[in-house]
Amino acid sequence: MPISSQRSTLRLLLVGLLACLLPSLASADDAAKRLRIGITLHPYYSYVANIVGDKAEVVPLIPAGFNPHAYEPRAEDIKRISGLDVIVLNGVGHDDFADRMIAASEKPNVPVIEANENVPLLAATGVAARGAGKVVNPHTFLSISASIAQVNNIARELGKLDPDNARTY
């Protein structure tokens, strides 16, 4: 085989190899840029996961199966915050443990999105609620209209933190 033919074959192989490698390098770079979003309660996991799709990673702050009403932060859960870009909170009393976790973490200034910001709230009722000093019912995710408002709040705020994907959110 003549040398010029070998060079042409080698160039063709190199171009093919680069064509195969470049997309994987780009996707690795995209994965490195994805937001890591912490959530405190399962409804917010569902909301956020559906908002971001494959554009971000959703990370529960507490392990599955824990009761958020009685949860006490563990060291490994607090440590998880250092790898997050933002945390989505209920913000009206259902996940008060998260404030203590964030304050004790290596990243106490991590941005926080309060899902219930500007969402009409229901007054807490019953002896247990009044005895616990609750003013509003924190189970806002049980209301369809409140859930819709929360999803819109979360999507809007994530769009501000991740403008490249704001249209997706």
Residue ranges and their predicted role:
Residues 2-14:
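Bacterial N-terminal signal peptides that target proteins for export
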Residues 11-24:
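Bacterial N-terminal signal peptides
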